[in-house]
Every structure is written in C-alpha cells, then in structure tokens.
Amino acid sequence: MQDPNADTEWNDILRKKGILPPKESLKELEEEAEEEQRILQQSVVKTYEDMTLEELEDHEDEFNEEDERAIEMYRRRRLAEWKATKLKNKFGEVLEISGKDYVQEVTKAGEGLWVILHLYKQGIPLCALINQHLSGLARKFPDVKFIKAISTTCIPNYPDRNLPTIFVYLEGDIKAQFIGPLVFGGMNLTRDELEWKLSESGAIMTDLEENPKKPIEDVLLSSVRRSVLMKRDSDSEGD
C-alpha cells in the first residue's frame, strides 16, 4: 500500500483533487513537536514544583539540561521560603541579655523586626510575674523578639522604683515604653492584659477582641452597685 504522506507526483494529484488531505509542511510538524515538548515540559515542571527539597534531590538524575535549569529555580525558591519560615519562627522564648549585647540584639535586631525588652531585677515580685507572662507571649508570638535584662546591666544606676520597665522597639527605634508598677496595675496584672497593652504599641497582633482590663470607672460602678444591693438585702432582713 502506498504511503499517503510520501512525496510523490501521484499523491500530489490526489491532494489537489481533495482525495488526500494536504501534506503538513515541515515547519508545521516542527511547531507541533515544539508544542508537545512545551506541554510535556510544563507537566514536568508542575510535577517537580510540588516536590520537597529532599524529593528534588532524589529525582535529579531524571532531569535533562532544561529540566535542571527549571528545577534549580524552584529549588532556590523553596530554599528561600524555608529560610524565611525559619527566620519567622526562630524565637518563641524570652532571651536573656546584658548591656554588652544591647546593640546587637536590639539596635541591629533586623529590618521589620519588633523587639520587646523587659528591664527587671531579682526579688521584685511584679518583675517575676511579667517574666512569666512574657514567656507565654513569646511562645504565642514567635515572630516577635522578646528579651529581658537586669536593669543596671543596660542602664547604670537605673532606679528600682522604675521597675518593671518594658521598652518596645522597631528597627532600633523606641515605639512604646511602660515604666513602673502603676502602669501595669500591680500584681493583679494578667497575661491577657499585658498582651493587650503590648498590642496597642503595634508590636503584636492580638486575637483578643476587647481590653480584658475594665476601665476604672466600670470597676467603681460595679463596686457601688454591689454595695447598694448588699444594703437593700440588709434593710429587707431588718424589716
């Protein structure tokens, strides 16, 4: 049987009569082959795009030169994403520093990085309470750098009456400061109240919907209401 794609005079006549379909040009065949290769390449890239770094290493013997260039691009991207994730989650605890570490840990902490510094001293109960609360907040907000330092190692002769003190920094600049026990409300301070206070500085994105510490006016009104109710109950019993 004669090949209908053969380049013969008879086949040319049959094509002119419409009996055979037009013969595809070499250029068209090449274009089709290139399109098939492109689709195949996209499929290969898509497959490897979904792989982990370890899987890419395992399959590198299957790559041709074009594959290797595409895969190297994805490998670099995945490595950058992994490093960014590690950077974002590299804290998660309160770091102890001294004065000599201040520049490196605070001033040069990094671009876009919030730093919360607690100046404290041993033997001050409220300082101990805040350190405890900060440990929980550091785990909750691992992208924020929580640090603590004995006050006089950072600021010589810093008065104890100013403790506890919290400074909030962004890129080395102070964005907020909380100085002295009255600012924190004394030993009744809860972790949620401290979280809310720090969130107002912009350092952390709290999931609390409202300030957990009631304004002093609300506290006084509640106290007055309780006193009135108690008096009414007492009067009723007297009758």
Swiss-Prot record:
Residues 91-239 are annotated as: Thioredoxin fold. Gene3D superfamilies: Glutaredoxin (3.40.30.10). It is found in: Cytoplasm; Cytoplasm, Perinuclear region; Endoplasmic reticulum. SUPFAM superfamilies: Thioredoxin-like. Keywords: Acetylation, Angiogenesis, Apoptosis, Chaperone, Cytoplasm, Endoplasmic reticulum, Phosphoprotein. Residues 97-99, 153-155 are annotated as: Interaction with XIAP. PANTHER family: PHOSDUCIN-LIKE PROTEIN 3, VIRAL IAP-ASSOCIATED FACTOR HOMOLOG. This is Phosducin-like protein 3. It comes from Homo sapiens.
